[in-house]
């Protein structure tokens, strides 16, 4: 249906654009800067207007002007350029046409890694479809290059089909979503839309307007290391204090034991020696009150464990990352209803459920543009088992076009 969609997607995923959490630049990697320039050129060649690369925040933005005389709300469509922290060098996508919904798909030549319905029962949903997989050595990058390809293809289609009426549409492709800072510098005034959607969801039908509230705790523990043979009543083992800290948290409130709207504490890093140790926690909850209570629990444990000492052995740097965008979006649910209607008119069953994570839309919503999240089609993201269906990407492209059309009525 969209002859350029698959070639466009394959071209994008072969471009390495991982973000780097240790970087102090925006974008965090030069590969993203180069990719942004490539996308800027492509947008210009499509015939989009006001194409800009913002060097301050790393976003490429462009405008498709309205082709209706009446005033209608302006819409934004957003996707991110970076991929997750997994090998993304020399991505070599494989194409499996007319998948039968049952067979095992070998990824690497040795057959060490496979996509099979035992481990990935979601494969059964793709009978008769064209799957794009990895070769087992890298991720694919459908998160979120499928979103970029879908937005780009939808804009191309609308430009080539002026009979489809729409208001002003703006698109934005940004950096560093995977490391949680992509939208920190997003320029709401420059983007200038009434509402937007991130095309960054998973399987067909996903429509999300509720995310976690998110915080991070960086913990530094100062021990006192002496020879173990003479350590009694003298040694303060920073590693043991770290273990004590972790054990003071609720044992069942961790990612591997929670689902749905249950929040958690996640020990993301723990390193050190008896002399000094560091820990990183991410704290997540959909409920704002429980979220605040979780942060308070971290501080309470710090105070309890510091109490026996004559100095502060445990220091906590606790900071918020993003908030549940539902608090913003529920003030005007019409933007969710438009997306829902678009899917239903395309015979797509909307799957409306909270995101157990965040999106760029989480921050952009609080910056002033309500921004729900729509499926982009990918499955098993962030690793070698990632795949996407061509038909899923076509459906996402259809949804973008249908939203634009419905908004203009």
From Swiss-Prot:
This is Peptidase T. GO terms for cellular component: cytosol. Zn(2+) 1 binds at residues 80, 143, 200. The keyword Metal-binding applies. The keyword Metal-binding applies. PROSITE patterns: ARGE_DAPE_CPG2_1 (PS00758), ARGE_DAPE_CPG2_2 (PS00759). It comes from Enterococcus faecalis (strain ATCC 700802 / V583). InterPro entries: ArgE/DapE_CS, Bact_exopeptidase_dim_dom, Peptidase_M20, Peptidase_M20_dimer, Peptidase_M20B. Disulfide bonds: none annotated.
């Amino acid at each position: 249906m969209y002859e350029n969609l698959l070639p466009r997607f394959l071209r994008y995923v072969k471009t390495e654009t991982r973000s780097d959490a240790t970087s102090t630049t925006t974008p965090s990697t030069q590969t993203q800067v180069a990719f942004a320039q490539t996308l800027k050129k492509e947008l210009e060649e499509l015939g989009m207007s006001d194409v800009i690369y913002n060097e301050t925040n790393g976003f490429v933005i462009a405008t498709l002007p309205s082709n209706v005389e009446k005033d209608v709300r302006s819409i934004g469509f957003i996707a991110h350029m970076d991929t997750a922290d997994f090998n993304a060098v020399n991505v070599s996508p494989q194409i499996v046409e007319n998948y039968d919904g049952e067979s095992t798909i070998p990824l690497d030549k040795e057959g060490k890694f496979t996509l099979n319905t035992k481990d990935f029962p979601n494969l059964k949903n793709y009978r008769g479809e064209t799957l794009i997989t990895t070769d087992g050595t890298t991720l694919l990058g459908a998160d979120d290059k499928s979103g970029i390809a879908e937005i780009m293809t939808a804009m191309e289609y609308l430009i080539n089909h002026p009979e489809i009426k729409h208001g002003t549409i703006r698109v934005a492709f940004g950096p560093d979503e995977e490391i949680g800072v992509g939208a920190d510098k997003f320029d709401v005034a420059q983007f200038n839309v009434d509402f937007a959607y991130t095309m960054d969801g998973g399987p067909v039908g996903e429509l999300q307007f509720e995310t976690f509230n998110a915080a991070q705790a960086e913990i530094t523990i100062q021990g006192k290391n002496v020879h173990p043979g003479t350590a009694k009543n003298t040694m303060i083992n920073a590693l043991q204090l770290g273990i004590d800290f972790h054990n003071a948290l609720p044992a069942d409130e961790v990612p591997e034991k929670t689902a749905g709207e249950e929040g958690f504490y996640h020990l993301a890093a723990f390193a050190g020696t008896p002399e000094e140790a560091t820990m990183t926690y991410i704290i997540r909850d959909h409920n704002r009150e429980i979220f605040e209570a979780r942060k308070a629990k971290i501080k309470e444990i710090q105070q309890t464990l510091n109490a026996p000492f004559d100095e502060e052995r445990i220091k906590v740097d606790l900071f918020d990352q993003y908030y549940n965008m539902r608090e913003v979006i529920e003030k005007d649910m019409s933007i969710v209803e438009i997306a829902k209607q678009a899917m239903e008119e395309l015979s797509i069953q909307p799957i409306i459920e909270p995101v157990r994570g965040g999106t760029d839309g989480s921050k952009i919503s609080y910056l002033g543009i309500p921004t729900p999240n729509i499926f982009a089609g990918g499955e098993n993201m962030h690793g070698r088992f990632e795949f996407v269906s061509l038909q899923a990407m076509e459906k996402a492209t259809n949804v973008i076009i249908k939203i634009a059309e419905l908004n203009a009525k």
